[in-house]
Every structure is written in C-alpha cells, then in structure tokens.
C-alpha cells in the first residue's frame, strides 16, 4: 500500500429541516481509491476522528466526517433530534456530496458508538448507497441500565416538552485507557454532555429497529468492539452481528479495550485491521 500526504478542507450543507451541517474532508494526494464517510458518537464531533482520517488518506482513501446536528460546529439545539431519521438524511447528503466529488469509486460508512447505530440503521434503510458498513462499539444497548424513572420521564416529556434536557452521564474515563485521549475529550470545548427527552425516545426507537433489521444487511460488514467496553454492552454487538445476513461479515473484538477502540492504547492494530479490510474490498 502506497502512503501519501493529504489535503484537508471544511464545508457545510443544508441538512434535514434546514439545519446547517458542518463537515470536513481529507483527500489523498493521488486519485482516491474509495470514499470513507465517518459518523461520530454522542456529544462529540468529527474532528476527534482527524487522526483516523489522516491515517486513511495515507492508504489512498478519502475521508469525509460530518458533525451531526446538535453537535460540534453544526446547527441545532445541542443533543436534540426531532426524529432519528434526520441523522440519516444528513448522512445521506454527506454521502452524495462525497460521491459527486469522487464518482465511480466505492463508498464505505464507518460509525462510532451513536454513529455506529446511525451507520447500521442507514445501511439497513439505504443499502444501495453503500458498498460496506463498519460499526465500532455501535450504541445498540448501554452497559449501565438506564433507570426506569428516566425512561418514563423521557417518554412522557418527548411529546409535551421534547427539548427538555438531561445529562448523558457518560464517564470520560471509560472511553480509553489512554489518559491523553480522556484529557483532550474533557477539555474539548466542542464536546457536550446533554441529550433531550425527544432524543432519548428516538434513540430507543432506532436501537430496536436496527437490532430487528440486522437481517436486512447483505453488504460487507466489519463490526468492531472493545472487549472491556463499559459504555456499550459488547453482548448486544455480538447479538447484532449474529443476525447480519451478509456472507461477508467480520467481528473483531479487542480484548481489554474500552469503548473507543480506535483511540485506545494499542489502536495501531485496530487501524491496521481497518486498512486491511477496506483494501480487500475495493
């Protein structure tokens, strides 16, 4: 695999409901071999994946990372979504923009945590848009049970006070064993810790539908999971993987890794596996 330097650009487009969606793109110096669209997790933003994007360009891929609505430099109330489908609409537009820039090459969608759920849900609903799905620690079920009272409140308020805001309760120390990753996350002004009542009920709906719809997946699938994930339940990832109908599916469990496998101590093996998987499918 030839290694090349990359060019970085920023842009924005109008997503669902007229919301401005910010994105970044990294291009290899030569002709791109394939498009990789990156979907980030809850409360974070696309720039946290710049190291992965840069890594991909060295192997000739072009990477496109959007900030989901209510996140990072995109518009919308922080941590809010009217409908989970709005995330899918935005991702779909990002894919179309990337394809317009790079016609005739394959497109892969890679999602992390909430982005893994978004990516899997998108792949089930719009299979013709993609040539492969990569989901890392997809948010199919939380490791810590959400208290029943919180679930009840969210369901009640979703209809009458949809933007009622609550703390995600996400513990940054469970992201990675790499203290520098945790420190940067905590100090990042674009990271937030909030979700709304409507977001929660839409998230639950998407979790259920994505788990049930796994047998719709016939495209190449790479599922990545940290074995010691304390945020997302690895058994849910395993259950999802087993339901995938694709004849080309791979589950990689990294023993002892926390939630963010690609930000872990030892992430080089994960990135290497990602390159190898992509290179074999273009």
Question: What is each residue range found by the language model?
Answer:
Residues 1-30:
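N-terminal cap/lid segment of alpha/beta-hydrolase-fold proteins
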Residues 33-41:
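Short beta-strand element of the alpha/beta-hydrolase
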Residues 48, 53-76:
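Conserved alpha/beta-hydrolase
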Residues 43-45, 72-106, 270:
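Catalytic nucleophile-loop/oxyanion-hole region of alpha/beta-hydrolase
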Residues 250-282:
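Catalytic active-site module of serine/aspartate enzymes centered on a nucleophile-bearing elbow/loop
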Residues 112-196:
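Alpha/beta-hydrolase-fold enzymes
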Residues 217, 223-225, 229:
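Short beta-strand/loop motif that positions the catalytic acidic residue
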């Amino acid at each position: 695999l030839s290694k090349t330097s990359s060019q970085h650009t920023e842009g924005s487009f109008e997503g669902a409901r007229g919301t401005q969606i910010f994105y970044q793109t990294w291009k290899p110096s030569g002709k791109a071999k394939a498009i990789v669209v990156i979907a980030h997790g809850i409360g974070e933003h696309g720039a946290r994946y710049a190291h992965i994007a840069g890594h991909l360009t060295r192997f000739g891929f072009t990477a496109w990372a959007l900030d989901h609505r209510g996140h990072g430099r995109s518009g919308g109330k922080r941590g809010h979504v009217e409908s989970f489908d709005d995330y899918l609409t935005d991702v779909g537009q990002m894919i179309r923009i990337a394809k317009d820039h790079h016609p005739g090459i394959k497109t892969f969608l890679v999602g992390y945590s909430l982005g893994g759920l978004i990516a899997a849900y998108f792949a089930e609903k719009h299979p013709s848009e993609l040539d492969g799905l990569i989901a890392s620690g997809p948010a199919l079920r939380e490791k810590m049970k959400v208290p029943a009272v919180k679930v009840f409140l969210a369901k009640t308020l979703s209809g009458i006070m949809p933007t009622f805001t609550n703390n995600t309760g996400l513990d940054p120390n469970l992201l990675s064993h790499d203290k520098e990753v945790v420190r940067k996350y905590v100090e990042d002004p674009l990271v937030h810790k909030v979700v709304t009542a409507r977001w929660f009920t839409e998230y639950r709906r998407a979790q259920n539908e994505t788990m049930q719809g796994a047998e719709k997946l016939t495209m190449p699938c790479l599922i990545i999971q940290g074995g010691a994930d304390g945020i997302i339940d690895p058994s849910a990832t395993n259950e999802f993987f087993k339901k995938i109908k694709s004849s080309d599916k791979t589950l990689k469990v990294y023993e002892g890794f926390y939630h963010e496998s690609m930000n872990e101590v030892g992430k080089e093996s994960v990135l290497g596996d990602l390159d190898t998987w992509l290179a074999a499918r273009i």
